[in-house]
């Protein structure tokens, strides 16, 4: 499918975490190396929403229009209001060990947060801060802000990256970047995952 594309803003270093607000018509996104969050308003004006984001990556809106943020440098999931204010850390450790570097995040309709936790943000690169890894795996987690419960859902990834639900939230799709494939999990009634077979290969001439 061919579509005409138009540049609406430019001059960034490495953009991630775009989220759309259907009510305000605004697009919010992160520039990871610059530790900044920007907002494109009504497709016209870009303004700086936050600075010192600790090399934030993925974003998602929760049910109250707060922004759930994956922070590489602090290895945590944090939350702000829609204006990037009232920052608070929701979860940063699994047991007594730091999370690796939360990468991407989705919020289920009941408010439970699902996120990937690869090691990209601990590698020597412009999008992270080099430091030893405390966990001995790269996984997928869920976190319930209401109860404070953090669940490890899968730990057999090389480096999980993007994730999304099916429209009915019955399935969770997670890509494993180094392996160039996407896996499909069934979301069980208790919030755990089953299955996990490869659903699509992301290989090709331009990849």
Model regions and ranges:
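Beta-rich, blade/repeat-based domains predominating
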Residues: 4, 9-25, 52-71, 76, ...
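Short loop/turn segments that connect beta-strands within beta-propeller blades
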Residues: 40-44, 81-85, 144-148, 186-191
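Loop/turn-rich, solvent-exposed surfaces of beta-rich toroidal or solenoidal domains
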Residues: 180-187, 192-193, 200-207
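Short, solvent-exposed loop/turn segments at conserved positions within beta-propeller repeat blades
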Residues: 32-33, 72-73, 122-138, 177-180
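Beta-propeller domains
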Residues: 22-51
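A short helix->beta-strand "capping" segment at the edge of beta-propeller domains
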Residues: 1-13, 42-44, 48, 196-197
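A short loop-to-beta-strand structural motif that recurs across blades of beta-propeller domains
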Residues: 36-38, 76-78, 138-141, 181-183
